[in-house]
Amino acid sequence: MSKNMRYPVKFEHDETGWAVMFPDIPEALTGGDTREEALAMAQDALVTAFDFYFEDRREIPTPSTKGEAFVEVPASIAAKVLLLNTMLQTRTSNAELARLLGTRPQEIQRIVSLSHSTKIDTIANALNALGKHLELVAI
């Protein structure tokens, strides 16, 4: 996944207002009376849609690079997306990752939950255990 996790949006307008859709994440839909209002609500819609992927243990698609506008994924969420996708790509269960980290499966369940705050070092350690390295870049 790219260093910047920014998902492109598509706008549609009719007499009822503006709709925002994410071509890469079709579950993420929102709208507003104005284009600006719809875009302001888009990040919440995107993160809410990610919850469905986490619950179903489905890989979250990589963002495409072309769009009218983009919505940035918060760093704390982006790190968890990277962890979930890595677990799925390596077919690593919560129990297996817990064994690799010397912790309980319940702790891994919290780590891969979007509703639970997790220290970035914890996510980095989990990715390291799966053979990946979490890299943060300021641009």
UniProtKB/Swiss-Prot annotation:
Residues 96-113 bind DNA. Keywords: DNA-binding, Repressor, Stress response, Toxin-antitoxin system, Transcription, Transcription regulation. The keyword Transcription applies. GO terms for molecular function: DNA binding. SUPFAM superfamilies: lambda repressor-like DNA-binding domains, TTHA1013/TTHA0281-like. It comes from the Bacteria. Residues 87-137 form the HTH cro/C1-type domain. Belongs to the HicB antitoxin family. PANTHER family: ANTITOXIN HICB (PTHR34504:SF4). Antitoxin component of a type II toxin-antitoxin (TA) system. Functions as an mRNA interferase antitoxin preventing effects of the HicA 2 toxin. Probably forms a complex with the probable mRNA interferase HicA2 (its cognate toxin); when complexed with HicA inhibits the toxin activity. This is Antitoxin HicB 2. The gene is hicB2.
